[in-house]
């Protein structure tokens, strides 16, 4: 872990730096998959990011104008991988599970420490959530082996999002967004976000 941290041990890379580096995040992954090469225009920070958090969103892609927008109120540790996710949409990738996969892969192959860390953190969260659903005890055993810095970020991220859970706006937003995804042809709706686990396992099982 080579990223800057604050006095509480939490990821403290300036969000302005993360945003400015966004145009380079796909440099590594395009060497593996050249069809992903695309003239990146970067992403935009949403002014009403706090409201995005109330709705449960970390990013949104406006296909009509080809613009990726990200929530800059939420913890910075997952901002790089969120940016990589939204930039996958710019490349014509529609399904959320595929964008989540590219969010991880592009970040960890970017060559930038702040993005690499964020990508692995996002990957752990998805894989960890899947493990927790089937074997909570195994999950906590593995989580107990994580470095203190990673644990600090997981706790900070959870504490941030806990304040917005179960509010009316988030519930309505989830219902509407789930319906929207299904109307676009994604039968799994919101569940598609967590299906990235299958892609991560399929890709990395032969590399470990």
Predicted segment positions?
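Generic structural signal for hydrophobic core residues of well-folded globular domains
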Residues: 74, 87, 91, 128-131, ...
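Pan-zinc metallopeptidase signature
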Residues: 150-208
């Amino acid at each position: 872990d080579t990223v800057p941290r604050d006095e509480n041990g939490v990821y403290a890379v300036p969000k302005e730096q993360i945003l400015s580096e966004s145009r380079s995040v796909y440099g590594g992954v395009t060497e593996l998959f050249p069809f992903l090469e695309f003239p990146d225009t970067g992403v935009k920070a949403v002014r009403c990011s706090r409201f995005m958090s109330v709705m449960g969103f970390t990013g949104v892609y406006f296909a009509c104008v080809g613009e990726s927008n990200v929530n800059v109120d939420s913890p910075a540790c997952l901002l790089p991988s969120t940016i990589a996710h939204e930039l996958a949409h710019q490349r014509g990738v529609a399904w959320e599970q595929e964008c989540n996969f590219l969010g991880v892969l592009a970040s960890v192959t970017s060559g930038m420490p702040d993005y690499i860390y964020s990508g692995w953190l996002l990957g752990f969260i998805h894989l960890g959530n899947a493990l927790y659903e089937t074997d909570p005890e195994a999950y906590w055993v593995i989580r107990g082996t994580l470095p203190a810095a990673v644990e600090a970020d997981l706790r900070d991220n959870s504490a941030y999002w806990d304040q917005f859970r179960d509010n009316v706006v988030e519930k309505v937003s989830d219902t509407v967004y789930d319906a929207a995804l299904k109307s676009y042809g994604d039968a799994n709706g919101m569940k598609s976000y967590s299906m990235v686990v299958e892609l991560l396992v399929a890709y990395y099982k032969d590399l470990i």
